[in-house]
């Protein structure tokens, strides 16, 4: 992952996290399409904007009914061919062990808004792309399918279990443990005994 001015690039995608400055005239970086950082209809600022090299984009916005007690997010997906999908999702009710990409983005937005786990956006992005040699890309159909992102986060924990990566390892571990907790509370996986 390359990090520059709070703008992150993974080989197939770009995104910005909370409290980052999104360049006003961002058209491409590393041959990436522009992020949808402002909703073209409501003019709301995105919590998590993502752009893929194929021209598709996903962005998460706080819904009109959003409050800290009611963390509803509008997640929008535009594919490179102009197809569009939008869902309203309660970020606190997402089971990351059985979630679509759109649900995972709502979960990441929920984590970001509550300030825990630390660096939630980057952690969620790692769970999305995985630790495989070839990062995972999601077509619109795949973005709507259910995936086990908790297990992918566990892979990130395992691969960084080395003193050289301890800071990242601890961040991934905090996210993994929170994912296990949310999964258990939302009817999914039960917390593993360590």
Q: Language-model segments: which ranges?
A:
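Type III/flagellar secretion export determinants
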Residues: 1-194
